């Protein structure tokens, strides 16, 4: 007998068939999922739970068991039985039934699938249209099962046929997944209509529209719109072919209509789009005789209507113009005459009935509107209760109504004439005109005020404690802030118009009391003079030390600086000398003036110089108080000299100001004027510390800086950075100290040797030289062992590694971990 040959139709026994046999796969379709997995980021390697729908004979389950992590859950289901597979759970069921869903839930427990695979197809052979629809319906059922079991971000791979329902399925996939892509792996035959859709990133919506998974909704055929006959008429060159066969009930391709019927038709464009020819009417027709007399009825037009499919846009326009003119000639478009209808006036009963109907309709509208509003309120209340928004909406309305009467009213203050007192900062009550006219006494609840004041004081104390704790926490966390706090930079006040807070507050209180008690003009003048005296303030102590300690102000001279710092003391001396000695005429005739350069004197004249000519009494007539004042001045000047090293120009603004003062661009009056701005005279009394600190930090005048000042500060910072750190300086100092100690020791020993009379001078010199060599000899440091990592060519090496000289030590990662463990244990025992 001859050897039988197996059929090889459509290339079924291709290379993937033999590869599947060699690899042990149950079908050649195994390579389809392998290629899809490689193309789309190896999603199977990341999946712990995989469901294979329509899994028979189980080739995709085999691939999943090989690629998925160990101990993964792989479930295969099909309508036909599947042979048992290692590391897989298989059962027989129809994926469109509820039994399949219950069995899947029983196997998966509370788990969710990371990947759902579907490679099912119906029994084909009935017809291509029927087979394609059945495949699409099966794919939709698989998607429905996948949606119930997929985890968020999961993957769904399915097989579908290219058919008219393909776009509908793709739209459904795009609603449920972030990325949807169709592919055809190389293992799929080219003659096959199958393609695979990979859906990644399942969105897991909280609410699912059931119509997305309903076959009747997804595969519903929408009615096609009417043909675009306008395009056929106005753009006949562009033809769209639709190969869909004949229309129902119409099996002819040639359509003809009489010309007069076309003229009488109300829809000429759609009619022309469906016709092939317009037939000419008989010659004895009365209407046609009228139309033939028209100028547009030419022999060319009669030839054009014999074949409408070859006409162009111009010909169709000419035909439509002829139709319009023909309708005018035949009177088809004539407007109907309007008939006037007389309306009888309404009787009294009819008028009353009409008004009643209107009122009834208005009442119904109001009732509907009120019902609608009540429904909206109920709906809002339901929403608020669902969102736990149960707070009463009317809360605070009563308090607002009560407090509205006590609000400050500027118009009332202007009418009552109390605006002037309010502008001076007096906390007065503003009363209404009626209360002032009645002169009623306004009684306050003293207990309520006391309680409210106690609560306010308690709240302020709590705020102060919280601010202090915040400052302490910040000081512990931030070293720079801690250093600033120790230096006192944090608490420095920018304005020093009053020498002490106590003095300023006392004076202000006295001024307030004085103004409330007296109303005469003389008292007001004295009060104004007192305020002006308070605002006059010289440079502060720190400012004087600053100008005295910097060399950049050397042009002013030490004597001028001394005189400027103690101008008030000199004035006091003058008054004292006049009262004590009584030589006013001699003192006034013989003043002792300062020696100032011509350039300085010119500046003094033009700029209201900072220096003042002060007459002094002769030395022999000076009293004890004068000598004491001179001692105080010299003592303060020496103290300023002592503090010179402590003052430093550290900011660009300070350096800019120093340059301007040194070069004569600014004098004392300019500095005083710049110090008076909108932030200068703010009342800081009885304010919490946190508020004052915030005001200091934010309420500042931004002063301009110069390029030269910035460069000077930058150069200064460079010099500071170039200095060695404290540890290096300390080490150098210790080294020098040790050298000095050795030198002293050598000196003592050499003195002892020189005092020894038993030795000769040569022996003494030799011993001293030996001592010097011994002390100056450098200490030898032990060479450190070279560490060689046991890796690469040095792994498992016995003997000295290549290129290593001297002592060496072999190390590896295990030794490193052991050393870390030993350090950790030692640290633990120390605790």
Curated annotation (Swiss-Prot):
Signal peptide: none annotated. The keyword Ribosomal protein does not apply. Its EC number is 2.1.1.-. It is found in: Nucleus, Nucleolus. Residues 499-510, 632-645 have a biased composition (Basic and acidic residues). Residues 346-389, 440-479, 729-782 form a coiled coil. Pfam families: DUF3381 (PF11861), FtsJ (PF01728), Spb1_C (PF07780). One of its GO terms (biological process) is maturation of 5.8S rRNA from tricistronic rRNA transcript (SSU-rRNA, 5.8S rRNA, LSU-rRNA). Its main location: nucleus. S-adenosyl-L-methionine binds at residues 58, 60, 78, 94, 119. The keyword Methyltransferase applies. It catalyses: a ribonucleotide in rRNA + S-adenosyl-L-methionine = a 2'-O-methylribonucleotide in rRNA + S-adenosyl-L-homocysteine + H(+). The active site is at residue 159. Residues 511-526, 594-611, 618-631 have a biased composition (Acidic residues). GO terms for cellular component: nucleolus; preribosome, large subunit precursor. Keywords: Coiled coil, Methyltransferase, Nucleus, Ribosome biogenesis, rRNA processing, S-adenosyl-L-methionine, Transferase. Residues 492-535, 565-645 are annotated as: Disordered. Component of the nucleolar and nucleoplasmic pre-60S ribosomal particle. Required for proper assembly of pre-ribosomal particles during the biogenesis of the 60S ribosomal subunit. Belongs to the class I-like SAM-binding methyltransferase superfamily. RNA methyltransferase RlmE family. SPB1 subfamily. This is AdoMet-dependent rRNA methyltransferase SPB1. It comes from Debaryomyces hansenii (strain ATCC 36239 / CBS 767 / BCRC 21394 / JCM 1990 / NBRC 0083 / IGC 2968) (Yeast). The lineage of its organism: Eukaryota, Fungi, Dikarya, Ascomycota, Saccharomycotina. The gene is SPB1.
């Amino acid at each position: 007998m001859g050897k039988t040959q197996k059929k090889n139709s459509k290339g079924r026994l291709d290379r993937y068939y033999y590869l599947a046999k060699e690899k042990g796969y149950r079908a050649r379709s195994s390579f389809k999922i392998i290629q899809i997995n490689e193309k789309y980021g190896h999603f199977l390697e990341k999946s712990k739970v995989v469901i294979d729908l329509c899994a028979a004979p189980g080739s995709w389950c085999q691939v999943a068991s090989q690629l998925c992590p160990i101990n993964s859950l792989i479930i295969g289901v099909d309508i036909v039985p599947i042979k048992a597979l290692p590391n897989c759970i298989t059962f027989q069921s129809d994926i469109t039934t509820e039994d399949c869903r219950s069995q899947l839930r029983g196997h998966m427990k509370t788990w969710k699938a990371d990947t759902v695979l579907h490679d099912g197809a119906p029994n084909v052979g009935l017809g291509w249209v029927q087979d394609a629809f059945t495949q699409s319906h099966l794919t939709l059922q698989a998607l429905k099962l996948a949606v119930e079991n997929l985890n968020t971000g999961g993957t769904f791979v399915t097989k579908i046929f290219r058919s008219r329902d393909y776009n509908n399925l793709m739209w459904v996939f795009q609603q449920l997944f972030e990325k949807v892509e169709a592919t055809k792996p190389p293992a799929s035959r080219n003659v096959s209509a199958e393609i695979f859709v990979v859906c990644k990133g399942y969105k897991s919506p909280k609410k699912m529209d059931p119509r997305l998974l309903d076959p009747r909704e997804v595969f519903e055929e929408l009615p096609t719109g009417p043909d675009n006959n306008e395009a056929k008429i106005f753009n006949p060159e562009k033809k769209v072919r639709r190969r869909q066969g004949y229309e129902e009930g119409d099996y002819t391709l040639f359509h003809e209509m009489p010309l007069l019927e076309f003229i009488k038709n109300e829809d000429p464009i759609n009619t022309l789009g469906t016709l092939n020819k317009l037939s000419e009417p008989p010659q004895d027709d009365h209407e046609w005789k009228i139309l033939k007399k028209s100028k547009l009825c030419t022999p060319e037009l009669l030839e054009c209507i014999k074949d409408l499919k070859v006409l162009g846009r111009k010909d169709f326009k000419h035909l439509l113009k002829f139709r319009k003119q023909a309708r005018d000639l035949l009177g088809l478009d004539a407007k109907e005459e309007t008939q006037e209808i007389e309306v009888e006036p309404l009787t009294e009963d009819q008028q009353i009935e009409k008004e009643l109907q209107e009122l009834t309709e208005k009442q119904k509208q109001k009732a509907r509107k009120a019902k609608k509003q009540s429904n909206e309120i109920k709906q809002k209340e339901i929403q608020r209760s669902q969102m736990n928004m149960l707070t009463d909406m009317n809360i605070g309305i009563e308090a607002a109504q009560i407090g509205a009467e006590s609000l400050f009213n500027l118009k009332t203050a202007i009418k009552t004439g109390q605006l002037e007192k309010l502008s001076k900062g007096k906390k007065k009550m503003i009363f209404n005109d009626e209360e002032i006219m009645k002169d009623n006494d306004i009684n306050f609840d003293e207990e309520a005020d006391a309680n409210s004041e106690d609560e306010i004081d308690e709240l302020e104390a709590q705020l102060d404690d919280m601010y202090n704790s915040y400052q302490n926490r910040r000081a512990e966390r931030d070293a720079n802030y801690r250093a600033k706090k120790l230096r006192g930079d944090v608490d420095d006040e920018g304005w020093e118009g009053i020498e002490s807070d106590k003095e300023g507050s006392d004076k202000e209180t006295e001024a307030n009391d004085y103004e409330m008690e007296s109303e005469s003009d003389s008292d007001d003048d004295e009060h104004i003079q007192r305020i002006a005296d308070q605002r006059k303030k010289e440079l502060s102590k720190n400012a004087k030390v600053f100008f005295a300690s910097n060399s950049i102000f050397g042009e002013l001279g030490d004597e001028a600086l001394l005189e400027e710092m103690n101008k008030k003391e000199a004035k006091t001396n003058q008054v004292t000398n006049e009262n004590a000695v009584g030589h006013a005429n001699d003192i006034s005739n013989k003043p002792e003036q300062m020696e100032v350069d011509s350039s300085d004197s010119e500046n003094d004249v033009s700029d209201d110089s900072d220096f003042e000519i002060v007459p002094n009494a002769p030395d022999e007539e000076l009293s004890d108080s004068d000598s004491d004042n001179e001692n105080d001045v010299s003592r303060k000047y020496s103290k300023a000299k002592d503090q010179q090293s402590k003052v430093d120009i550290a900011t660009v603004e300070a350096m800019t100001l120093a340059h301007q003062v040194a070069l004569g661009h600014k004098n004392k009056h300019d500095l005083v004027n710049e110090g008076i701005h909108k932030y200068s005279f703010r009342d800081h009394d009885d304010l919490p510390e946190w508020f004052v600190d915030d005001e200091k930090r934010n309420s500042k005048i931004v002063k301009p800086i110069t390029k030269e000042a910035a460069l000077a500060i930058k150069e200064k910072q460079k010099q500071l950075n170039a200095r060695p750190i404290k540890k290096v300086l300390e080490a150098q100092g210790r080294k020098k100290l040790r050298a000095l100690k050795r030198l002293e020791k050598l000196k003592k020993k050499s003195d002892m040797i020189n005092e020894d009379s038993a030795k000769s001078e040569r022996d003494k010199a030799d011993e001293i030289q030996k001592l010097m060599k011994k002390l100056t000899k450098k200490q030898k440091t032990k060479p450190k062992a070279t560490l060689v990592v046991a890796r690469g060519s040095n792994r498992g090496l016995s003997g000295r590694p290549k290129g290593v000289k001297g002592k060496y030590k072999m190390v590896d990662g295990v030794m490193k971990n052991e050393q870390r463990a030993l350090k950790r244990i030692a640290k633990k025992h120390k605790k």
